[in-house]
A protein has these predicted regions:
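Class I SAM-dependent methyltransferase Rossmann-like catalytic core
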Residues: 77-130, 134-196, 208, 215
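C-terminal His-loop and adjacent cap/lid subdomain of alpha/beta-hydrolase
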Residues: 207, 212, 379
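Conserved S-adenosyl-L-methionine
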Residues: 203-205, 251
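Histidine-anchored nucleotide/phosphate-binding helix
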Residues: 212-221
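Class I SAM-dependent methyltransferase core
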Residues: 199-201
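Alpha-helical recognition domains of nuclear gene-regulatory proteins
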Residues: 70, 97, 109-112, 216, ...
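Domain-level detector for long C-terminal conserved domains
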Residues: 2-10, 16-59, 136, 149-158, ...
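Phospho-regulated, Ser/Thr/Pro-rich intrinsically disordered or coiled-coil terminal scaffolds
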Residues: 65-77
Length: 450
């Protein structure tokens, strides 16, 4: 299951102007947009260093055409699963061509969804705590409930004759209780040492979402350091380093070698992602703070997500207490076309198993967002199908989800455009085949487990 293709680096990038068919209100012109384009430049520079030797190869274009032919003929296992030196080259050429634009898009989406904050690598605005397990985002329902609690408290204190200063102090203490409650739901186990959180990325073999997540965390950690959030003089009770993040990239192809290269490139670019001393099995060991683990297999195979005889946990454990994030990027339509029944069963398993507070991000190309239903040529919008499977229908419907998910973000046709200088940044490392980075219009859903 794979996402299929539909000079010195500059410090900042400008975003391409929209085409006539694109939505003009998506033009980033704020400080946040400047920050986003700068971090995109860092990510593209990393990928440029990684793939430049490959693009300079005289056989790059011919190999790329061969890979395109395999994809056109839907020979995905041949393109991505051939166990040979030639097969490894096919995978690298595919990644060099399509990963950069996908990674930039996913990086922006992760930023928009506050994934770094959710994983404990970025503190909420205005706070200087060291982080730890992080604070989960609030839904509109929670915000309304908390505002009702504040209003109720103010009303009661006024009736008791309290002064304005006393009321303000009481409301501030209530706000601290709200933050503590949110953080406790996101924190994983462990005291003193950094916690461990897990992210399961389905269909992530080529690594677009993996490098995007690594870049988002690396930039967030650098921001914490520059703002003083990581001040070692803070009391131990106040400061905790960001948790180790274990990424489980699940795919049918043989992507382990390429993912190892990408993970090492991320750790070289952002040393905060590199190893740390942790106590495991009674000894002190070095473990990457950003740990990428490849899991080969078909996620629709029931053996992947159920506990085998003699095993304490399944290959992919959606019920792990340390699970914080699940992603399915540019893969969900392929799964549904492969088997709608098995895909809905997978969503049901995730819904039953995932711990409360887990974020579930699904992204798909808007051009693939009409799912065929039945034999009459009818189609059904992907976003509506996902919402019904995960959020609607109660215990009797919704693909078994029982309404256990709430929608935090919903887009049915949002454009993500490459910065103007993206091609120049990515193609900057010497001569070779020039790669054109492409805009994408996507369907996006961000859910949170209740």
């Amino acid at each position: 299951m794979q996402q299929k293709p539909s000079r010195p680096v500059k410090a900042t990038l400008r975003t391409r102007q929209p085409l006539d068919s694109e939505e003009s209100d998506l033009q980033p012109d704020s400080n946040a947009a400047d920050s986003s384009t700068s971090s995109s430049a860092q990510l593209l520079a990393l990928l440029s260093r990684l793939f430049a030797p490959l693009r300079r190869s005289p056989n790059f274009s011919a190999t790329l055409q061969h890979v395109k032919g395999l994809l056109y003929d839907q020979q995905y296992l041949a393109a991505f699963g051939t166990e040979s030196e030639e097969g490894e080259r096919w995978r690298e050429v595919y990644a060099a061509r399509w990963v950069p634009s996908r990674a930039v898009i996913y990086q922006r989406i992760f930023d928009e969804c506050d994934i770094a904050q959710h994983l404990g690598w970025q503190t909420p605005s205005g706070e200087t705590n060291g982080g730890g397990g992080g604070e989960r985002p609030r839904s509109e329902e929670e915000e309304l409930e908390q505002e009702r609690e504040r209003a109720k408290l103010r009303r009661r204190l006024r009736q008791e004759g309290k002064s304005a200063d006393e009321i303000s102090q009481a409301v501030a203490e209530l706000e601290q209780q709200f933050r503590a409650a949110r953080s406790s739901k996101a924190d994983s186990k462990g005291e003193g040492a950094a916690a461990v959180v897990d992210a399961i990325m389905i269909g992530a073999g080529a690594g677009s979402e993996v490098v995007a997540l690594g870049a988002v965390l690396g930039v967030a950690a650098a921001g914490r350091a520059s703002s003083g959030d990581a001040d070692p003089t803070l009391a131990a009770a106040e400061y905790r380093p960001p948790p180790r993040v274990r990424v489980h990239a699940v795919d049918q192809g043989s992507w382990d070698v390429l993912l190892d290269k990408m993970a090492q490139g991320l750790r070289d670019a952002w040393p905060t992602l590199d190893s740390e001393h942790v106590e495991e099995d009674g000894g002190d060991q070095q473990q990457p703070r950003f740990d990428v683990r490849f899991v080969k297999g078909n996620i629709l195979d029931n053996k992947m997500i159920t506990t085998a005889a003699g095993s304490s946990s399944p290959v992919i454990d959606f019920g792990s207490s340390s699970l914080r994030l699940i992603t399915i990027c540019f893969t969900i339509t392929e799964l549904l076309l492969q088997s709608r029944l098995e895909t809905l069963r997978l969503l049901s398993t995730i819904s039953r198993s995932a711990p409360s507070g887990t974020l579930f991000l699904i992204v798909e190309s808007a051009s693939l967002a009409q799912i065929p239903i039945g034999q009459e040529g009818r189609t059904y919008p992907l976003g509506r199908l996902l919402d019904h499977a995960l959020c609607g229908g109660g215990d009797k419907g919704g693909g078994g989800g029982g309404g256990v998910w709430e929608i935090l973000k919903s887009e049915d046709a949002k454009w993500y455009r490459m910065p103007n200088d993206a091609d120049e940044v990515y193609n900057a490392m010497g001569k070779g085949t020039k790669v054109k980075l492409e805009n994408s219009r996507v369907v996006l859903r961000l859910y949170r487990k209740r």
